[in-house]
Swiss-Prot record:
Cysteine disulfide links: C26-C115, C28-C44, C43-C95, C49-C122, C50-C88, C57-C81, C75-C86
Active-site residues, Swiss-Prot/TrEMBL: H47, D89
Gene3D superfamilies, alphabetized: Phospholipase A2 domain
Binding-site positions, Ca(2+): F27, G29, G31, D48
Compartmental location: Secreted
Assigned EC number: 3.1.1.4
GO molecular function terms listed in the Swiss-Prot or TrEMBL record: calcium ion binding; calcium-dependent phospholipase A2 activity; phospholipid binding
Cofactor notes: Binds 1 Ca(2+) ion.
Catalysis: reaction(s): a 1,2-diacyl-sn-glycero-3-phosphocholine + H2O = a 1-acyl-sn-glycero-3-phosphocholine + a fatty acid + H(+)
Organism: Bothrops pictus
Lineage top rank: taxon: Eukaryota
Protein's recorded name: Acidic phospholipase A2
InterPro entries, alphabetized: PLipase_A2, PLipase_A2_Asp_AS, PLipase_A2_dom, PLipase_A2_dom_sf, PLipase_A2_His_AS
């Protein structure tokens, strides 16, 4: 679920997903079009693509199971669809963490009209 995604971002990237990525670049936040503007925006592009491959459950609302083992988030549970959502969220949170140093405030609340280029395929 989106609430769990926020929790994973806080755990892994040590920052608020809603605040930092709720409206960033062309892909972070609701919707997405154009080309990713930087590495953090690309994290969101890949996350959108990952959610797009989920067919048997709802990534935005379905609750998944995960645990922490030696500080590492491990997705679990018996439902393969929910596990897939968890993996999408976990990979994105790791991506945000790994690209914090190139996060650029100029892409915060980036106008959608700057995202008119043709999108690359997932």
């Amino acid at each position: 679920s989106l609430v769990q995604f926020e929790t994973l971002i806080m755990k892994i990237a040590k920052r608020s997903g809603v605040w930092f990525y709720g409206s960033y670049g062309c892909f972070c936040g609701s919707g997405g079009q154009g080309r990713p503007q930087d590495a953090s925006d690309r994290c969101c592009f890949v996350h959108d693509c990952c959610y797009g491959k989920v067919t048997d459950c709802d990534p935005k609302t379905d609750i998944y199971t995960y645990s922490e083992e030696n500080g590492v988030v491990v997705c679990g549970g018996d439902d393969p669809c929910k596990k897939q959502i968890c993996e999408c969220d976990r990979v994105a949170a790791v991506c945000f963490r790994d690209n914090k140093d190139t996060y650029d405030n100029k892409y915060w609340f980036f106008p959608a009209n700057n995202c008119q280029e043709e999108s690359e395929p997932c």
